[in-house]
């Protein structure tokens, strides 16, 4: 069985453009001796669409995931969690196709394996890793035709007990096998799951490299697998606010990329990978405390490049990004970000064209 992550490469012209921009930006940082910046003049981009608000009041919307329909990109899907009630499925314009009350679903992630969509979520109601498998053929119509019961017990699925209070989750395919990282609420543990064997194969401590660790506020939530480069990037919250990178094969720390002493304002939250080709591109991080989004080089040593804001978006938790071309709608892919306020309505997710981000960096 072929287990290959869904990867859409950007065109050569875009690759050359982005590579040139990356070189110029890094050169600029070196030339001007840029380190931590208090400059508030970050470029601001507008969003091109937004999802309908979630049903729950207050802090509820949290984490998105994107599935790209390679046969018809207009019929791609955005999954979004209401961490107090369940999972939404939206079209690319933010319209609700399906919503199901599944409990306190905090984070969600997915991969495509053969012709199936594998979706994982962190269920805080039951302290379980919930693992759903959907056939990709006709999946858009499936969610459209099942507006309130798409996550059916008749589907192939698993509810895996974590044995701890859980928080965030991310999924990857490492050495051909589906895996997941599951983080602990108000704790320092990250579980590494083998999703073929449906079991935990390692647990590591996100504070193991630190001295004088505070007693509270050390949990991680946001994380992302870089399947091709075999990394896990984890955003560690609390007073120190680290973005850390681990080896996805042995879960050993590779590097502390950034912190509150650098370019992170408040808690680092959602983290995502924008792929230019199989191994190059960008890491994007939600710097929640100052409502900006940091850009880093995807390759080691993960150099900080710059930051930007999204118009009228603040206090962002989860994010997801894809480089897949969505035609005239978003030729260089989209970034989906949770909006922590969205006043006067309940929280929702904003959809940003990555073309606008790159234009602002010119």
Residue locations for each model-derived region?
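Short linear sequence motifs
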Residues: 8-10, 25, 40
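Sec-dependent signal peptide recognition
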Residues: 20-27
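C-terminal motif of bacterial Sec signal peptides marking the signal peptidase cleavage site
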Residues: 32-33
């Amino acid at each position: 069985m072929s287990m290959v992550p869904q990867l859409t490469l950007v065109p050569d012209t875009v690759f050359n453009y982005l590579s040139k921009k990356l070189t110029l930006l890094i050169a600029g940082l070196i030339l001007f001796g840029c380190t931590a910046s208090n400059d508030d003049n970050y470029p601001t981009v507008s969003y091109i669409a937004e999802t309908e608000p979630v049903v729950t009041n207050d802090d509820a919307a949290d984490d998105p995931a994107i599935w790209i329909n390679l046969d018809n990109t207009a019929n791609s899907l955005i999954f979004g969690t209401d961490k107090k009630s369940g999972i939404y499925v939206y079209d690319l314009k933010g319209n609700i196709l399906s919503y199901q009350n599944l409990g306190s679903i905090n984070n969600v992630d997915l991969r495509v394996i053969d012709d199936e969509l594998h979706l994982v979520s962190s269920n805080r109601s039951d302290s379980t890793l919930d693992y759903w498998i959907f056939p990709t053929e006709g999946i858009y119509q499936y969610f459209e035709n099942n507006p309130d019961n798409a996550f059916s017990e008749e589907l192939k699925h698993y509810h895996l007990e974590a044995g701890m209070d859980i928080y965030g989750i991310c999924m990857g395919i490492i050495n051909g096998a589906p895996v997941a990282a599951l983080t602990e609420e108000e704790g320092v543990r990250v579980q590494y799951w083998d999703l073929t064997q449906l079991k935990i194969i390692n647990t590591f401590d996100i504070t193991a490299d630190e001295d004088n660790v505070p007693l509270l506020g050390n949990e991680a939530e946001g994380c992302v697998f870089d399947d091709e480069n075999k990394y896990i990037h984890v955003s560690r919250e609390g007073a120190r606010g680290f973005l850390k990178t681990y080896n996805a094969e042995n879960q050993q720390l590779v590097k502390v990329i950034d912190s509150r002493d650098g370019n992170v304002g408040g808690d680092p939250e959602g983290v995502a990978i924008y792929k230019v080709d199989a191994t190059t591109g960008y890491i994007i991080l939600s710097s929640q405390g100052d409502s900006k989004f940091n850009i880093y080089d995807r390759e080691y040593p993960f150099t900080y490049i710059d930051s930007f804001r999204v118009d009228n978006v603040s206090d962002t938790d989860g994010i997801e990004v894809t480089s897949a071309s969505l035609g005239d709608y978003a030729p260089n892919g989209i970034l989906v970000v949770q909006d922590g306020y969205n006043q006067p309505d309940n929280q929702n997710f904003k959809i940003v064209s990555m073309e606008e981000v790159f234009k602002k960096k010119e």
